Structures are given as C-alpha cells and as structure tokens.
Amino acid sequence: MSSSPLSKKRRVSGPDPKPGSNCSPAQSVLPQVPSAPTNGMAKNGSEADIDEGLYSRQLYVLGHEAMKRLQTSSVLVSGLRGLGVEIAKNIILGGVKAVTLHDQGTAQWADLSSQFYLREEDIGKNRAEVSQPRLAELNSYVPVTAYTGPLVEDFLSGFQVVVLTNSPLEDQLRVGEFCHSRGIKLVVADTRGLFGQLFCDFGEEMILTDSNGEQPLSTMVSMVTKDNPGVVTCLDEARHGFESGDFVSFSEVQGMTELNGNQPIEIKVLGPYTFSICDTSNFSDYIRGGIVSQVKVPKKISFKSLSASLAEPDFVMTDFAKFSRPAQLHIGFQALHKFCAQHSRPPRPRNEEDAAELVTLARAVNSKASSAVQQDSLDEDLIRNLAFVAAGDLAPINAFIGGLAAQEVMKACSGKFMPIMQWLYFDALECLPEDKESLTEDKCLPRQNRYDGQVAVFGSDLQEKLGRQKYFLVGAGAIGCELLKNFAMIGLGCGENGEIIVTDMDTIEKSNLNRQFLFRPWDVTKLKSDTAAAAVHQMNPHIRVTSHQNRVGPDTERIYDDDFFQTLDGVANALDNVDARMYMDRRCVYYRKPLLESGTLGTKGNVQVVIPFLTESYSSSQDPPEKSIPICTLKNFPNAIEHTLQWARDEFEGLFKQPAENVNQYLTDPKFVERTLRLAGTQPLEVLEAVQRSLVLQLPQSWADCVTWACHHWHTQYSNNIRQLLHNFPPDQLTSSGAPFWSGPKRCPHPLTFDVSNPLHLDYVMAAANLFAQTYGLAGSQDRAAVATLLQSVQVPEFTPKSGVKIHVSDQELQSANASVDDSRLEELKATLPSPDKLPGFKMYPIDFEKDDDSNFHMDFIVAASNLRAENYDIPPADRHKSKLIAGKIIPAIATTTAAVVGLVCLELYKVVQGHRHLDSYKNGFLNLALPFFGFSEPLAAPRHQYYNQEWTLWDRFEVQGLQPNGEEMTLKQFLDYFKTEHKLEITMLSQGVSMLYSFFMPAAKLKERLDQPMTEIVSRVSKRKLGRHVRALVLELCCNDESGEDVEVPYVRYTIR
C-alpha cells in the first residue's frame, strides 16, 4: 500500500476563526508556523517534552501539537473485558496523560476469549486490578491506575474523556447526561458476538483543527485573471488536488502582489488545473510565478447528548452493501439492553425462545421510537442473529471496534481528525457457517474453558478446527504482533498438530515500542520473532509458536520448501514492503494456499483475502508506481524541500558509502577495473574518479584534514556550483521562445557565503567531517568550538566560473550526453590509480544510512545539506522531524489503525478456516480512521483465460512428470512433443526464471545440442547454477501457438523432478 507521507500539522488555538473570501490583508487570522530551527544539531528541530525516539512514527500521523494535547488528557476506561482492554492498550500506547481502569466485575472463563491480559489463574479476580500492572508496562510515560468503586459524579469530573464499554443503557444515559453537561467527552463502545456499536459525544463546541490529517497541498501558479471572481490556473505538471470550500494562501506571486501574504481565501474548483478565488479586478496585473498552498482552517462541530442522539441518530456507514442495517441495529441494541436488564444475562446462544423474545422487544422499541428512528419494516432475521450471538465475545471484533474507539478518544483529546458523528454499527455475519443449519444450541454451550466466548458464536466444531491449523506468519512487527495476539485469543494453532511459524529477521528498536505492543523497553536489541512468540505464550499457554529469523525470498527456499508449504493451512503476511508481499503471493499461488494480506499507512489500512481457485491474487492488481523526481531537477533545478532532501540523501550515498565500497573492491578484487569498464555510459568514469579521489586527491591524514575537506566541499556545493550554474544561465536568461528561463518550476538560485558563526554552516562541517573521518577509520570530534577554530585557518581556493561547461536542462539531454565516454580520460585514470600492492592492509569503512540514531551524524548531515541547498533556491527549510520522514522514507504508523486492520484480517480468517466457498462471503476492506471512512467489497474473482475450449485461471497449471516410468528424465525434445500430442500446443519459447531454454529462433547448432539433453541439465547449464536437493519441481513459462498458428496464452508448467 502506498500513499503520500503525512506531515506535521500546525496547532490552531483560540476561538473559531472566520477566514474571509475577500482578498484583504491578513490580520493574523491563523498562528504562524514556527520556522525550522537553523541548528539541527543543537535543537534537532524537535519538541523537548515529547520522546521522539518512542513516538516517532505516531508523530508523523498526529503532529507535535496534537500529541501535546494528548499528553494533557486523562482518560477513564470503564469495563475491562476484551473490548475495554483493547481500547486501554491503544490509548496507553498513544501517550495520553493518564488512564484509569474501572471494573467492578471479576474475571470469568468467557472473558479469556478476548481479554489478553487475563490468565487462567485470574478467574474470580477483579478484571481492572489484574489488568493494571500488565497495561502499565506498555508505556512508562502514562500512569495507569485501577478503580473498583461506583461511577459517581465527583469521580467522573476528574477526566477529560470517559469511555464506557459493555455497559447497561441505563448507566450510559446517566453518565452521558453528566458528561454532556460538564463538557467531558464521551465514547460508548459495545461488542456483542459478531456485532459492534460505537457512539461519540464530544460536546456542543468542539474545535476541529484538521479534518483529514493529509499534508496541505501546494502547487505552482501559471496565471491569475483580473476578474470577479479571479480565476487561478496552475502549472499543468500535476492536478492541483483542491476541493471547493478549501482555503488557500499565496506567496511569490509577481505582479499581482496583493495576493501575497493574504489571509486564507476560500476557493471554488473549476477544473483539475483551475479554481476561482475572490474579486481581483482592482488588483495589479499578474506577471508570473507564485505558489498557492492549502491552509487548514479550524472549524467548530457540535454533538448531541446520548439521550438526544438516541432519538435522532446520525450514522457513519461501515458497509454500503448493508445500507439499512445501522438503523435496524439501533433498534436491536436498545431491545438487547432491555432483554439484559430483565434477565440479568444476554440471550442464550442459538436459543430460539430467547431470540423470539428479543424480536418481540425490538418490535416494542420500534413502535415507540421517534419518527427519525422508527423502521417501516423490522429486519427480524437480523434481530434473531443478534440474539443468537449476543453472548459471544470475539477478539477480532473487539480489535476492530477497540481500534476505532481508541482513535475516537485521541480525536476527543487532540481535535485532530473528523470524529464519528455520532453512531457507528458494524456486523460480520458473513463469518457464520455458509450452511446456516450446522450450528445448534448444544454446540454453542459453554465448556468452562478460555474459548467459551467464541464457542457461543461458532460452536465447538470450529474451535477444534482452529486448534489444528498450521499457519505461516511472515513478519513480527506491528501487524505481526496484533495477529499473534488474535491467534492466541481465538485458539489458532493451539491444539494437537496445530502450529504458528513466525519469521522476522529484525531486532527490536525503541521506535517499535509505540505500536508493536508485545515488546517492552528491556526487549530492545532482541529478536522480534523470539520475543513476540514468548510474549504471546503468556497470553495463551496453549499456543504453539515456532520462531524463525529468516528473510523470505529465493535465498531461503531450501528452508521454506515444498515439504514446508504442503503442511500449511494458510499464510498471513505482516510485511512492510511490496517486493516481499509479491514474493509470498507467488509462493501461495504456486502452493495453492490461502493468503491473508494487510497493510497500514498512518490512519489508512487495507485488508485483502486471497483464496485458491476463487479470488484474484495480491499481484493481480498493483498500485501505480511512485512518481520519481527527474535527475536534472535534483541536480540543478529543485523547487520543493522534497527535492533538496533527496539530493542530500544522494550526497550521503555518494560521499560516505559508494566511494568506500568501490575502494575496497578495487583493493581486493583484481578484476574490479575490468568489470567497471564494462558498465554503461559514464559510469566507468564516475566510479574510477571516485576511487582516485578517495585514494589520492582527498586522502586525509588527520582530523584537521577532514575538517578542511568538509569546508572545501561546502564551498563546492553551495557556492561554486551555483555560481557556475548562474554563469551558464544568468538570472535574466531567456529561452528560445523569449520566455524567462528562470520561471515556472525553475527557481533562480543564489550562492551562499560561508560563515563559521552561522549554526547551519557549522552543523554541515561538523557532520560531514565526522562522517568523512569515519569512512577512513579516523577519530572525529564533537567539539564545535575547536572545529570553528580549525576552520579559520582553512584556505579556500578562489573560484572562477568556467566557459564551455555543459549543464543539462532535461533528463533527455543528460541521457544522450551520458551515452558517450572520454576514453583518453579513462586511460589516464587507470594509469594514475595507485597499485593495490602499495596499500597493504588499507581499507575504508562504508556507512549505511541509519535515520533513527541521533548520535551518528547521519540526520545531522541530511538536515544541514538539504536546508543549505533550500537556502540556495529560496525554498522554505524543513525541521529535523519532517526531514527524517522524507529522507528516511518513514511509514507513519499508529497502534489504532493496526488493531482495527488486524481485527478485520482475523474475521476473514474465520471464513478461511471454515472453508467458505462463496465469493460474496469474503470481504476486502479499506479504512481511513481520520475521515472516518470504511469501504468493503467482495474480492475480485480470478480472471479467466481460455485456449481451445479449456478455461484456466492463475491457480491452474500444467503438471508434467519429468521422471519417466523407466527412471530417465524427459529431454527437451520429449517435452516439446508432449505438449504437441497431449495439448495440441506448439511451444515457441520456453524459459525458467530469467533463463531462456528454447526458442524457435535459436541457432540450429545450439538447438540440435539441446534437444536430446535432459531438462534439468539444460536449466543448470543456462542458469549456471546447480539445482539444490530441496528443489522438487521447476516452474517453466511457455509461449505457444495453437494448431492454426495463432499465439495463445497458457498457464505455467510445474515440472516435477523428484
């Protein structure tokens, strides 16, 4: 899953401002965003009171200001069954000020179905008191206390947010009225078997600072008309992305300068590149340029109290295929509360008498309901299903509703993201058996064991089947931890012959602790898979988890081989990159195993289920590739901070990693030069010049030499190169058409003058000199004063721009220039490189970029290098936090989204284990908790293809036994003849991986040689690799013609050799 990274948002405080649509000068309507600190090393551009090491990934979702507001909010969570503990876990990880756990009940067997911090020895103990020490471990910044008294008003008044879970309606109404009258924000959450309910009341005057959390859009202006209203046209490089009603501000407009620095202006979108603003008819004429930026304007939203909203509800849809269901469930849940009040228990599982009574109660509730709620026709089957499962308690439903509820708590605390207005209902009845008659009351009776809450919904047969499952979990990060927790709760792999195999090669880092909730501070540096397996064993001692530390890929196919996959019942991906996802998808298609796929990005998440012979696979559809930045934009014409940050990352690699690697290869590999000369274009020249610089021209002998190098490099990049660029293209340069060269996306730069008293200049030298020293194994220094003193004695050669230097304006120009290479310069370089014999024992130390260690100078270099270049081009700088997001390609993450997404994954798991065969039983899902938005759809069926009268999908293949009855292996000729006689197909090309084994245009001599060779011998010869003993079959790809000579698309071949 890919999307634009989210950025830090500004905080807006005070009353709700009223930005105008008139174009009058700004009157400080919105607070100004503080400029990025100039001294990245001194202040790191970070907030002193937020632990950025811990909250790093969450800060990219919420921003610093929302995070600060979160840290001033005390939250009460009432009810510590499975739903309550899920909400408490997520908000404690999120970092609120304090959490109080309230429960007057004791742990029962049924609670263990989903309450992951209760153990069998806790039966009979107070749920809040038992859970408190285990929840408190999650985040040392959040005090967690337990309270077992009544919810009296004096007690409630000490909280900013109150969360009620699994509570009687009578209590909800009483607490709701009190909270609404006192401005205390209220979240009510409830789960009943396969059903969930959520309600929010954040008061009558809540200030919403940012409704969607997306990075404010910004684009370049190409024209503004003098009109009423004025029409703005943007450069046609990309659509502006604005919506009508958005507010924007302008900067750098030439001519119509009245727009610059204006208060936010409301716009109306006219097209993908145009929108109208205010009356510009009296403004100056527009000349050129300008940047228009979206402004997040705070707005006031109002909530009804619980009692008022009960009578006049507003619903957030979770599934548009169930459009009428929220209103039906609104009646059903009220009837359920009446049933529980009358009987002091929920309806018995699958009990017809109780179901009939609930239907009667629902009719009564409906008949007395207000006109806004009353249903013309009550869905009595739905009400009966509610009765049948209401006694159940399912970990996946609690994970989903708990993730949503915890996100609502964070919205209540921070004013960030649009809250649920005000009711949300959810059901997953598709999880029930497709054979509706297979469940009976007897099968759903409690067994006095930890799975009673689940048996109440699905019966004992599924419980036994879950226990026998053998699943492969790939990844033990955020999604992996949540999956393991859910697996433990539902009993997956907990029975005889059951097993979960989890693999992850990573170790635990501090930034993981904020959302990978199975890990603790004392686990940092330990292996994720081992630690997660041990932690989940505490939650359910019956779970059988085997932990591995292997990366999945061709290199580990000897471990995850045919025998391994054939014993599996399914695979769950918990990966963070597309390549690994696609690899596992291919493996699952090949071995015909179900795959549960999911991913998150900030508040966004997605779930996909892949079922053999039924659905398409993960790789059947792909996101469009991310747009890359043109090389010439990076090298000479940046116009956004993203460009300067990517340039700084390239600088890091080109200064501190690649030259050191090339030098080490040159000194140890006699064929290095020969191999380098075979590279394309100007690469041989660039590589050998870098080796020469590292070993001859720039070889430092001391720390002072490193400081000198850093100072010279500063001048090269931020003064000399810019002066050369301006020599080639002066500020007043015109294009061949007479237009200014420096216009549109090309920003005219200016050279910088080195100033040792400028903290940013000294930051750069400190970081660059230390990293340069590190590559040579020299000791560095953190003494800024000493470095400043050294810099005063550095002699910087005078620079004069040269004539005849070619600077490429486009990537096409660059490519054509790179096609030729100066052979005489190459020969000269080869002659001047020192012989490896003369440098015995010398080696360099390449540096791998590590963004999360603030002491290693890596981010110090990136921030300084990027912001200096930004200053060259008058681009607003970025602080360390934003720089780390972009340069480090960080994926924003928050525990709430992960919990909700994994809840949905495990609902699909129920269906997979039961063997559902109807496509409409399964649900692919997408959610965005910030909006909030939920979208569910049936998976797409596997696309069908045909040759002759034979239909096939990606799940089909030709099965060919390579070993014949006489014990000899099939030759290429026999293979070709087999397809001609058995399938009436003439093979025109045959390949294995990237190796071409046969083609119709192959030279006659080579073809004659191969025809009588065994297939595996040809594969080994062409690929130059011996087949491992673990390889039992080869995947062969075919191009074929039918009998009429037409190309036909056919499946691949599984060619069995053992």
Swiss-Prot record:
Q: Name one Pfam family in it.
A: ThiF
Superkingdom in the source lineage: Eukaryota
Which sequence positions carry the modification called Phosphoserine?
A: S4, S13, S21, S24, S46, S810, S816, S820, S835
Keyword flag Calcium: no
Any one Gene Ontology molecular-function term assigned to this protein's record: ubiquitin activating enzyme activity
Q: For this protein, what reaction is catalysed? A: ATP + ubiquitin + [E1 ubiquitin-activating enzyme]-L-cysteine = AMP + diphosphate + S-ubiquitinyl-[E1 ubiquitin-activating enzyme]-L-cysteine
Residues annotated as carrying N6-acetyllysine in the record are K671, K980
Q: In which pathway does it act?
A: Protein modification; protein ubiquitination
Compositional bias of type Polar residues: which residue ranges? 21-38
- Note the segments forming the sequence repeats: 63-199, 459-611
Q: Which InterPro entries does this one have?
A: E1_4HB, E1_FCCH, E1_FCCH_sf, ThiF/MoeB/HesA, ThiF_NAD_FAD-bd, Ub-activating_enz_E1_C, Ub-E1_IAD_1, UBA_E1_C_sf
Q: Which residues carry this modification: N6-succinyllysine?
A: K528
Q: Which EC class does it fall in? A: ligase
What is the recorded function of this protein according to its Swiss-Prot or TrEMBL entry? Catalyzes the first step in ubiquitin conjugation to mark cellular proteins for degradation through the ubiquitin-proteasome system. Activates ubiquitin by first adenylating its C-terminal glycine residue with ATP, and thereafter linking this residue to the side chain of a cysteine residue in E1, yielding a ubiquitin-E1 thioester and free AMP. Essential for the formation of radiation-induced foci, timely DNA repair and for response to replication stress. Promotes the recruitment of TP53BP1 and BRCA1 at DNA damage sites.
Report the protein name in the record: Ubiquitin-like modifier-activating enzyme 1
Native organism taxonomy: Eukaryota, Metazoa, Chordata, Craniata, Vertebrata
Gene from which the chain derives: UBA1
